[in-house]
Amino acid sequence: MRAVGRPDIGGEPMPPVFRAFDDNQIIFRRAEVSMIAGQPGAGKSTLALALALRMQAPTLYLSADTNAHTMAMRLYSMITGNSQSESEKIISENPEQAKQALAQARHIYWSFDSNPGLGDIDDEVTAIEELLGESPALIIVDNLMDVAMDGGEEFGGMRSAMKELKYLARDTNAAVLVLHHTKESYSADPCPPRSAVQGMVNQLPALILTVGQHQEMMAVAPVKNRYGKADPSGNTPVWLRFNPEYMYLADLEEAR
């Protein structure tokens, strides 16, 4: 992967985004791997995109699961408050207007390789280092099952990928955020338990959040938290206001 060129540093918290997270010691930290896990459609990517946009820190977003057009549409909605259908129309018919709004996310650097290997991820990080003169502060992998690993069975490959991503976090002092699936056979009411995370990859992340969607709310449960409160059952989540049509995600007291 990457040669370790400096002593391990890190652990600094990333900029806060949601008060509900701060109040419950849900903190994303540099030089650590964190994970957001949930069933398909639960809002994992929406939460990750909101974090990337609002932290305003140099970010590498590896969007293996979603194409560039869809991510632009989602991001435009999140920035402007338009619905995704309205955003798609504006991006198509008035690209200059769209570019002006999307400039608020100029700190996010994108890769849309649908099956990146660890070497590809390393190359993307190196390209940002050459451009900015420093490593990205946040690296988002969306999602773990799309990371290509040579040989071996699928779950073993995911565990190997997690080990390499931990090395990457330490080497770059970046907060690495991995999106992953939970088993659909487990209840997601309000959130899946830690045992539902696929592939037995629970050991390495410092923070694991599972998510569930409930009407106009997103439940976010810290099922593992090295630096704060956790409940492996997923039964004690924090709540955010959530409207996926508008890519709207906010603390309850800020709901519009």
Regions found by a protein language model. Name each.
Residues 59-153, 239-242, 253-256:
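Conserved inter-motif catalytic segment of the P-loop NTP-binding fold
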Residues 22-24, 41, 160-256:
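Phosphate-binding/switch region of NTP-binding enzymes
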Residues 34-36, 60-62, 109-111, 177, ...:
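Hydrophobic/aromatic beta-strand patches that form the interior of the parallel beta-sheet core
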